[in-house]
Amino acid sequence: MRKIVRLMKNWQFIGPEGNTTAVDLPHTWNAIDGQDGGNDYWRGTCVYRTRFAAPAFEEVSQQVWLQFEGVNASTKVILNGTEVCVHDGGYSTFRANITTLLREENILTVEVDNSVNDHVYPQKADFTFYGGIYRDVSLLVVHKDHIALGHYGDTGVKVTPTLCKDHTADIRVETRLEGEGTVRVTLNDAEGNTVAAAEGKDVTMTLAHPHLWDGVKDPYLYTCVVELEQGGEVVDTVSTRVGVRSFRVDPKKGFFLNGRSYPLHGVSRHQDRKGLGNAISREMHDEDMTLIRELGANTIRLAHYQHDQYFYDLCDEYGMVVWAEIPYISEHLPNGRQNTIDQMEELIYQNYNHPCIVCWGVSNEITISTKDKADMLDNHHMLNDLCHKMDPTRLTTLACYAMCGPFNPVAHITDLVSWNLYLGWYVPGLFLNDLWLNFFHLVYPNRALGFSEYGAEGMPNLHSEHPRRGDHTEEYQAKYHEYMLRCFDRHPWMWSTHVWNMFDFAADARDQGGEPGMNHKGLVTFDRKTKKDSFYLYKAWWSDEAFVHICSKRFTDRTASEIEVKVYSNQKTVALFADGQKIAEQTGEHVFTFKVPLNGEVKLQAVAGECIDTASFRKVDTPNPGYKLVKTKSKSANWV
């Protein structure tokens, strides 16, 4: 049977200056300089080295494999002086059989390179390309005859559930072997009861009454257990979870899950954290999911690369519909075609069994700085065909750059299309969002359209009673999103909408909002400690969990004698009290606005059913200068 030995402790890191530092994994060398602005974070080759004792194994009957779950971006692995493997691509799992190279004591050297080059994606994008070994490293001890480990980093087991017209479900299980043996397949329900079983490397089992994976309300999962037997003895086992669901997209009616309308409203997510970069823990993944669920989202765009398998597992468990993509982004590389193929193959093979995933993202904003348009289009057609060949059960999509017009041929290659539009932020005029959507839908009524990115920068420390585009205030960000939510309500045919972004994230080329190196469009701050007002706006729109929230709490000092106080809630009635006296009670939806006299300091209490929130404001003679963005002379305000 399999045994896993983690290699996470006691590494030596040889950095850019040649200095050696003791580190544990996960680790990145850009945790600080990749987040402080200047577009000068160090990109190059660093070395990780560790010593380990060979795990206990039978040389005649077992093998030892080395597994990396994420190393950015190009990797050369050397064991005891012998090159084991190389890998280009910073976000996927890869493995190597090291059985014949093992000694009693071993030296493992990993050369990691995130330098600028012309063939490995990403090379240009609005996020930091952290270098390092930032996910788990393990030794896998397996029988010499085992369920395959050497196939694109996947599990060796491919499960395809199909919901039939008679409401039964066919579960096809294909097992790839390295060696010989008898394959036995068991399907268990959530309580551990066996509901189907079969024998063979390619089998189909039928569920008479399948319990569906039904989004956030009921994300039911079966477990498929594949055993490899020899002489009546189980020598290897792989388990994978299975969700039975159907989905489709109607250009005129939106997304459907299991035959019913299921509007997709959610967020995009980058994986990095303040002071840590992409070297994060499972507990941090859990925290991200908890915050996304609190918001009431039902879909996540996992941008702009393959995320940790653990997070896809969480999406399965909590019913999040996922857009998964490769980092074919911003700039087409004429020498990068094979890398797009490799990364797409790894993405699909490694994530095929996740019921949460409904579409494969081919590219993002690829027209920003692409010169060879013919080669770029050919690359897209090739990737689109590859996705359909590898996985005919899912759809393909891409995210178009704002300046990529509706008539651009790249927007008509994939099954679905979405746009990254920031009308009302980078471009004046929130009303343009409605005009743009109406125009596209008029010209292409049979083309499914979504918004893959939309947002505005919002700093919790910046405030204004008269928020304007570009002021980076918490109030303008909220005002922007209020409009966008109403806009989407006017266009219910959209197949999906994804806020950019759930969390602030590092983009070292940026200098905006008074904090260089960051993109502040998140609904939650980079450290996950502060939920901006916009977070509560979406919670009011999407969540069933009763709450009430007074906005602009951090905007304490006011110069006006009467202030407008905004309250977000998903309750129908909100009452506002000032110093214990009821000012007013309103009935409405999502957004409630009150006028409050201000003379000195006032303590407010908002009440919605059993929910209560409080805030304090005070009148001052002069504006608090800390609320206003100090303009800089930086020429690198944006990343492009």
At which residue positions do the language-model features occur?
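Secreted/periplasmic carbohydrate-active enzymes, especially glycoside hydrolases
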Residues: 1-306, 312-314, 318-322, 343-346, ...
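Substrate-binding/catalytic cleft of secreted carbohydrate-active enzymes
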Residues: 172-174, 289-292, 299-541, 545-564, ...
